[in-house]
Curated annotation (Swiss-Prot):
This is Crocetin glucosyltransferase, chloroplastic. GO terms for molecular function: quercetin 3-O-glucosyltransferase activity; quercetin 7-O-glucosyltransferase activity. It comes from the Eukaryota. Its EC number is 2.4.1.271. Residues 1-45 form a transit peptide. It catalyses: crocetin + UDP-alpha-D-glucose = beta-D-glucosyl crocetin + UDP; beta-D-glucosyl crocetin + UDP-alpha-D-glucose = bis(beta-D-glucosyl) crocetin + UDP; beta-D-gentiobiosyl crocetin + UDP-alpha-D-glucose = beta-D-gentiobiosyl beta-D-glucosyl crocetin + UDP. The active site is at residue 17. Keywords: Chloroplast, Glycosyltransferase, Plastid, Transferase, Transit peptide. It comes from Gardenia jasminoides. One of its GO terms (cellular component) is chloroplast. Belongs to the UDP-glycosyltransferase family. The keyword Acyltransferase does not apply. Crocin is a yellow pigment that accumulates during fruit development. No other crocetin glucosyl esters detected in neither flowers, leaves, nor stems. No correlation between mRNA expression and pigment accumulation. Its main location: plastid.
Length: 474
């Protein structure tokens, strides 16, 4: 009897991990594969409270991170959280695997997102083949890989020199601002857990021969970077964005359906009332909180641009009320010129005819969505992989311009206005950016079409994973 394929998909409990994981699950479900998505108890409870529907046929499981009522960063070290996540998560993950086997639907392959190297260890103990779902550009994996293989001292000793640059295999020359923030010397210790976790991830992969790494990218987007690590089997299966905007296999799939935040209702009507290509969309993702001074500069920059805008400013979490000092000084003027919302379906905004450009933090999900939707951008990176993504946007794919901060690290209103005008105007640069954005839109869609590069790569992975399970279980 042929064993029903059952993929257990483990995702770190953050919006930027859940979204691509859900899209990956959707792809597998359409191939007739049973999928169980597991995330933390608290993250799943928040997903169920949001209005989005989840993919039909997808089953859910939870693991404990030790904070089932929600992790509160204040007063708790992130390193302590990651340690609890690894310990508690490993134990509960074993239970999920054992329960599935007892119910007659054993897990045949385990796939996990980054920051969860312990999931691969559990899979190995349970004799289940595993694969990492890398949800950043493969360029960033290349940087981490080579950083720990001979490039660390160069970065540590020279990255404070503004004239210094470095070139990793398969990548363009980069300055310090283009590198993942976690490898740069910093006084910010709140995320000191990150670099050791990435190192542990690579060490875990190195324990296997030719480990499989599924990457949320596509062959045409990062051709050299995908070949830069010979010891890994890097498999491009992206972009992991809703089907209606890509391959059309499911026209009803128009959102990610796993929001941890409640969406606003009325922004669509507002967009419908604006002229084509006129709106500036501003969003800095689900994690980043900007200083008040920077928020004021963005506000003034938007007002100076004179263009209608849709700006996502997340509401305070845990029911905290906004304090008077948090309120933007020019709020009345802002509300006259544009619209401010606490959350929205970004992919629906990016595909709206009224949209002209996206002022983005350059998180990888957002970056891919701009490419899929053919939207030029103002790149406004802050931390983690965002500087690398901004480098690729500006200098490799040439679909946007990057803001230049002042000496204090603040991006001033005039600079924001300059970048918006460069992208939105019909000058030579603006026309070129829009043309390139349209080109990448077509290439992204080609990759996900039937027998496109990513479609073929995913089918080959599924076929191979089935063989791997049979070998492990014999």
């Amino acid at each position: 009897m042929v064993q029903q394929r059952h993929v257990l998909l483990i995702t770190y409990p953050a919006q930027g991990h859940i979204n691509p994981a859900l899209q990956f699950a959707q792809r597998l479900l359409r191939m007739g594969i049973q999928v169980t998505l597991a995330t933390s108890v608290y993250a799943l409870s928040r997903m169920k409270k949001s209005s989005g529907s989840t993919p039909k046929g997808l089953t859910f499981a939870t693991f404990s991170d030790g904070y089932d009522d929600g992790f509160r960063p204040k007063g708790v070290d992130h390193t302590e959280y990651m340690s609890s996540l690894a310990k508690q998560g490993s134990n509960t993950l074993r239970n999920v695997i054992n329960t599935s086997a007892d119910q007659g639907c054993p897990v045949t392959c385990l796939v996990y997102t980054l920051l969860l190297p312990w999931a691969a260890t559990v899979a190995r103990e349970c004799h289940i083949p595993s694969a990492l779902l890398w949800i950043q550009p493969v360029a960033v994996m290349d940087i981490y890989y080579y950083y720990f293989r001979g490039y660390e001292d160069d970065v540590k000793n020279n990255s404070n020199d503004p004239t210094w640059s470095i070139q990793f295999p398969g990548l363009p020359s980069m300055k310090a601002k283009d590198l993942p923030s976690f490898i740069l010397p910093s006084s910010d210790n709140i995320y000191s857990f990150a670099l050791p976790t990435f190192k542990k991830q690579l060490e875990t992969l190195d324990e296997e021969e030719r480990p499989k790494v599924l990457v949320n990218t596509f062959d045409a987007l990062e051709p050299q970077a995908l070949k830069a690590i010979e010891s890994y089997n890097l498999i491009a299966i992206g972009p992991l964005t809703p089907s209606a905007f890509l391959d059309g296999k499911d026209p009803s799939e128009t959102s990610f359906s796993g929001d941890l935040f409640q969406k606003s209702k009325d922004y669509k009507e507002w967009l419908n009332s604006r002229p084509a290509g006129s709106v500036v969309y501003v969003s800095f993702g689900s994690l980043l909180t900007l200083p008040k001074q920077q928020m004021e500069e963005i506000a003034r920059g938007l007002l100076k641009s004179g263009r209608p805008f849709l700006w996502v400013i997340r509401a305070k979490e845990n029911g905290e009320e906004e304090k008077e000092e948090d309120r933007l000084i020019c709020m009345e003027e802002l509300e006259e010129q544009g619209m401010i919302v606490p959350w929205c379906s970004q992919i629906e905004v990016l595909t709206h005819p009224s949209l002209g450009c996206f002022v983005t933090h350059c998180g990888w999900n957002s970056t891919l969505e701009t490419l899929v939707c053919g939207v030029p951008v103002v790149a406004f990176p802050h931390w983690t992989d965002q500087g690398t993504n901004a480098k690729l946007i500006e200098d490799v794919w040439e679909t946007g311009v990057r803001v230049v901060p002042n000496e204090d690290g603040t991006v001033e209103s005039d600079e924001i206005k300059r970048c918006i005008e460069t992208v939105m105007d019909d000058g030579e640069k603006g026309v070129e950016l829009k043309r390139n954005a349209k080109k990448w839109k077509e290439l992204a869609r080609e990759a996900m079409q039937e027998d496109g590069s990513s479609d073929k790569n995913l089918k080959a992975f599924v076929e191979d994973a089935g063989k791997g399970y049979q070998a492990e279980s014999n």
